[in-house]
């Protein structure tokens, strides 16, 4: 609602909630962009029917868009239930990954310039797969931290305030808070939020160590300048992400 009488009617119908035009505008922009993305994926699916490859991936993309639309709806109707919010987040990452895979799949028909062999990187494949798993786990922990409004609990580095270990509870961190009317601003007690935040910081330390090792080894063993630059770009993104993560605690 944008008019005063409509806002008053909405406020009277839902007295426990407060109308926030700024949040409503952001939500509508998100919905319009999501709808545009859905139309683009539908067009990709239609065009892929006439292509020799990429049909299965395009069909999976369309199915994932439908699932994402449902998760987006449940995010609202279930009042920001954390498990739905995290699933919606992972759906977005999966969409991006599948679009990149589709681009790679459709680009196989084009002739590629000869590239130098990379025997030095073959042994790094297990470490690369480990980095992918660790990164996905850290993204999940970050989404769980945000969905449960646990980001502002710990203010000291490297893990939390003194005495956190005595109150840490793994069961509380991964408990599913069900049956609440709304999950906005979080419903978990301090111990659970603190445990979630500590796990996220531990995950950040592990992810930083694994990714930094992979970047340094790729820079050292890669034969092509292109791959060395790509490794440097990943390292720069890692430094940026760590900086953004520790900045709130440093500023405070």
Q: Which sequence ranges carry the predicted segments?
A:
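Polytopic transmembrane helical bundles with strong interfacial aromatic enrichment
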Residues: 1-252
